[in-house]
Amino acid sequence: IIASHSQGSLLARRILKKFFDGKPLQNRLIAAYIPGIKILKEDFTEIKLMTNPEQFGGFVSWNTYKRNKLPKNYDLWYKGGVTSNPISWDSQKKIDNEFHLGLLYFDNKIYPKSLKIELIDGMVWTTIPKVPNRFFIILASFLTKKGKDFHFADINLFWEDIKQNSIVRINKWKEINQIK
């Protein structure tokens, strides 16, 4: 599994292209979780976008922003980018909070059912998470982009969803490859 964010996702994309895409090592790739930058399907020739929660050998990516808001440079930085659903891991465009497995908050606790999301072209729109002292998450988003940008939490918002999905993908890969 390759997991990265933002500048790390820039590096992960280069590593995937150079060492995995269409190469023997691709058979060992379970999943690449590469949020925080604009990723295009065309960035890879053989590594495909994963569109169901058990699929392996591909990648997922997303960029998180406050619902009903668009960044100033939306067309350049987000539009046209891959937008995976980091809760259902399929093509559902809207997910209610009851399906959210949990975010990792600053108190090091997991808070399930704390946000709703909607996928648009190049972005995941989210509600402000329902967590204790949510003032801190609102403050952090204001310090970045006037309360709209949740880039700083692309991973934390979906922490438990990513964790559980990676387990599903690992188990499926092991099953198909007959590894105990």
What are these regions (language model features)?
Residues 1-2, 174-179:
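Surface-exposed patches in mature extracellular/periplasmic domains of secreted proteins
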Residues 2-12:
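Gly/Ala-rich beta-loop-alpha elbow adjacent to hydrolase catalytic centers
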Residues 13-17:
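Short, hydrophobic alpha-helix immediately C-terminal to the catalytic nucleophile
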Residues 18-168, 172, 176:
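Surface cap/lid and interfacial helix-loop subdomains adjacent to catalytic sites
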